[in-house]
């Protein structure tokens, strides 16, 4: 299964397009336990969605739980280090920057030292990035 999380109006073929309301294929509240079984998702696309979810640990743990071993997730967020991208939108509930993902990376300093204390179960391998989404102006 492939998930397009926070799809809004972008319905992709061959994906389960997920959002909090229509026109999504599946309506789901991602602040709750996710409705997919463990190890059932091969690929998840999360473009401009996870910053709208209040609990970063819950979000990353659920992504990890639903992915099959070797599954992939592609995440794009506005970086808090850039300021306006995150701060201007009142619907953003969590801040992310490039280093945020280290806390969910297998073998990282953050996972080794504190993961269990905070309930972090996700153990991703970052295979590309993180990179910052560029801010561009059209002239």
Where are these regions (language model features)?
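Conserved SAM-binding loop
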Residues: 2-82
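S-adenosyl-L-methionine-dependent methyltransferase catalytic module, highlighting the catalytic core
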Residues: 54-64, 68, 72-139
